[in-house]
C-alpha cells in the first residue's frame, strides 16, 4: 500500500495537487454528511412523531458539535504542523506530532464520554429541551455518547492520512462509515422499530467501522505510522502538545461557537416562535451543513498544500495555492447561493414534507443565507491562517464573528429591535458581511508581505 498512488507535494503542480486532494476530500465530506443528514431525513419521517422528534434531536446537535470540535482540535491542529515539518524534511518530528495528537485525542474521547453520561439531561434542558423533547433527545444522545471515542478517532486522525498524500484512502475511510450508516439507519429505525434510538445505534456502529479502518491504515500501511506515546516520551512532546492545541484552537473555537449560536438561537426561538421554529432552525442548520460540505472539502484539500510549501519556503507556490483556493470557493458559493434563493422549497423538502413547517422555513432560509457569499472571505482567511501556523489570527477571527457579532445580534435584533424570529435569522448575514470582510482584508495585509520577504 505504500506504493499506491499518492499526491506528490514535492514535485507536483500546485493546481494538480489541490484538485487531487480536493476531489477525494469532496466525496469524503459528502459521505460524512450522511452520518447526520440521513439520521434527520429518516427521523423526520417516523410516523406521527417525525417533526417533534426532529426538533428534539436538533437539541442534541450542540453536544455532537462539541465532540467534533475536540476531534478537530487535535486533528486539524496537528495535521498542518505535521505537513510543515514534512516540508522541512523533519519526518521524526512530524511523527512525534502525529503521535501526540493521537494520544491527546484518545484521552479526551474517554473524558468527554464520561462527562456526557453524567450531565446529558441537565445540558439538554439548558439547551432548551422541554419535557416532551427530552423523551426523544435524551435516549438519542446517551446512545450516541457510547461512540464518542470511535467518532473522534475517525474524524481527528483522518487529516493525517490526507497529509501524507493518501487522499483516496482518506475518502475510503469516510465512505465505509457513511455507507454503513445509510444501510443501518432504516434497519434500526423502521424494521426493528427502535425509532430515534435506532438512528443513534446505526451512527455509532458506522463510526466504529470507520475508526477501525483509520487505525488499521495509520498503524500498518501508511508511510509514517501512528501509535500512542510511551510514558517516557510525554515530557519531550509537551511542547508539541501546546502547539497542536494552540493551532487547533481556531477550528475548535469556530465549532464551539457554532454550538453556542445554536443554543442561543433555540432559546430565543422557543420564546418568540415556539417549537415549530426550533424545527425550522434544525432544517436550516442541516441545509447549511449540506451546502458547506464542498467548502470544507476545498479548504481541507488546499490546507496541506499550503502548509507543505510554506514549510519548504516556496512563497510562489503558497500564493498560487491561496489564489486557486479563493477562486474555487467563490465560484462554488455563487452557484449554491443562487440555488438557495431560487429553489428553497426543494432543499427544505429533503428534510420535511410538513406543509406548515415549509411555509415558515422558506422565508427563514432566505433570510439566513442572504449574505452567505461573504462567508467565503472568512473561510479563505481562516484556512490560510491555520495552514501557515498563524495561531493568533486564526483564534481571533474564530471568536470575532460568532461570539462578538452573531450572539449579541441574536438577542439584540429580536428583542431590542422588536424583529422577533426574523431577527434571529438575519443576525447571520449581518455577521457574515462584517466578520468575513475584516478577516479577509487582514489576511491579505499580513500574509502577502511575509511571502514577499520570503522570496528575497
List where the protein language model places each region.
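Short alpha-helical transmembrane segments in multi-pass integral membrane proteins
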Residues: 1-22, 82-147, 191-248, 306-371, ...
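Alpha-helical transmembrane segments and their lipid-water interface positions
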Residues: 28, 32, 36-43, 68-75, ...
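Small-residue-rich hydrophobic transmembrane alpha-helices
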Residues: 54-114, 151-170, 266, 278-338, ...
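Transmembrane helical elements of multi-pass membrane transporters/channels
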Residues: 20-39, 143, 177, 206-210, ...
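N-terminal transmembrane alpha-helices
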Residues: 9-49, 62-77, 81, 106-113, ...
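Helix-terminus/linker motif at the lipid-water interface of multi-pass membrane proteins
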Residues: 30, 34-55, 124-131, 187-194, ...
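Short runs within selected transmembrane alpha-helices of multi-pass transporters and secretion channels
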Residues: 72-75, 144-162, 170-181, 199-214, ...
Amino acid at each position: 500500500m505504500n506504493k499506491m498512488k499518492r499526491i506528490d507535494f514535492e514535485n507536483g503542480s500546485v493546481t494538480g495537487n489541490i484538485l487531487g486532494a480536493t476531489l477525494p476530500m469532496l466525496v469524503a465530506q459528502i459521505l460524512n454528511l450522511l452520518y447526520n443528514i440521513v439520521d434527520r431525513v429518516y427521523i423526520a419521517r417516523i410516523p406521527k412523531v417525525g417533526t417533534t422528534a426532529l426538533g428534539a434531536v436538533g437539541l442534541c446537535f450542540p453536544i455532537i458539535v462539541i465532540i467534533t470540535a475536540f476531534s478537530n482540535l487535535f486533528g486539524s491542529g496537528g495535521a498542518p504542523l505535521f505537513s510543515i515539518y514534512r516540508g522541512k524534511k523533519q519526518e521524526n518530528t512530524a511523527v512525534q506530532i502525529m503521535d501526540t495528537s493521537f494520544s491527546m485525542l484518545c484521552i479526551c474521547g474517554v473524558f468527554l464520554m464520561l462527562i456526557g453520561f453524567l450531565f446529558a439531561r441537565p445540558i439538554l434542558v439548558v439547551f432548551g429541551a422541554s419535557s416532551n423533547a427530552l423523551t426523544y433527545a435524551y435516549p438519542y444522545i446517551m446512545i450516541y455518547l457510547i461512540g464518542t471515542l470511535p467518532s473522534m478517532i475517525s474524524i481527528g486522525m483522518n487529516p493525517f492520512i490526507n497529509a501524507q498524500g493518501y487522499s483516496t484512502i482518506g475518502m475510503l475511510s469516510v465512505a465505509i462509515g457513511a455507507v454503513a450508516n445509510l444501510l443501518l439507519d432504516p434497519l434500526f429505525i423502521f424494521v426493528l422499530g427502535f425509532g430515534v434510538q435506532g438512528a443513534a445505534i446505526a451512527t455509532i456502529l458506522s463510526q466504529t467501522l470507520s475508526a477501525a479502518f483509520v487505525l488499521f491504515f495509520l498503524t500498518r500501511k501508511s508511510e509514517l505510522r501512528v501509535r500512542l506515546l510511551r510514558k517516557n516520551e510525554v515530557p519531550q512532546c509537551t511542547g508539541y502538545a501546546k502547539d497542536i492545541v494552540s493551532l487547533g484552537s481556531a477550528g475548535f473555537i469556530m465549532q464551539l461557537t457554532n454550538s453556542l449560536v445554536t443554543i442561543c438561537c433555540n432559546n430565543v426561538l422557543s420564546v418568540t416562535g415556539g417549537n415549530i421554529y426550533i424545527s425550522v432552525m434544525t432544517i436550516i442548520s442541516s441545509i447549511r451543513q449540506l451546502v458547506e460540505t464542498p467548502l470544507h472539502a476545498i479548504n481541507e484539500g488546499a490546507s496541506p498544500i499550503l502548509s507543505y510549501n510554506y514549510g519548504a519556503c516556496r512563497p510562489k507556490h503558497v500564493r498560487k495555492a491561496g489564489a486557486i483556493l479563493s477562486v474555487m470557493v467563490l465560484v462554488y458559493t455563487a452557484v449554491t447561493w443562487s440555488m438557495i434563493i431560487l429553489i428553497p422549497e426543494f432543499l427544505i423538502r429533503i428534510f420535511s414534507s410538513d406543509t406548515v413547517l415549509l411555509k415558515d422555513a422558506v422565508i427563514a432560509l432566505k433570510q439566513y443565507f442572504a449574505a452567505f457569499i461573504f462567508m467565503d472571505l472568512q473561510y479563505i482567511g481562516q484556512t490560510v491562517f491555520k495552514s501557515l501556523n498563524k495561531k493568533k489570527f486564526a483564534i481571533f477571527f474564530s471568536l470575532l464573528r460568532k461570539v462578538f457579532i452573531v450572539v449579541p445580534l441574536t438577542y439584540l435584533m429580536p428583542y431590542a429591535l422588536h424583529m422577533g424570529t426574523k431577527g434571529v435569522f438575519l443576525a447571520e448575514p449581518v455577521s457574515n458581511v462584517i466578520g468575513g470582510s475584516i478577516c479577509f482584508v487582514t489576511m491579505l495585509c499580513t500574509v502577502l508581505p511575509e511571502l514577499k520577504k520570503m522570496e528575497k
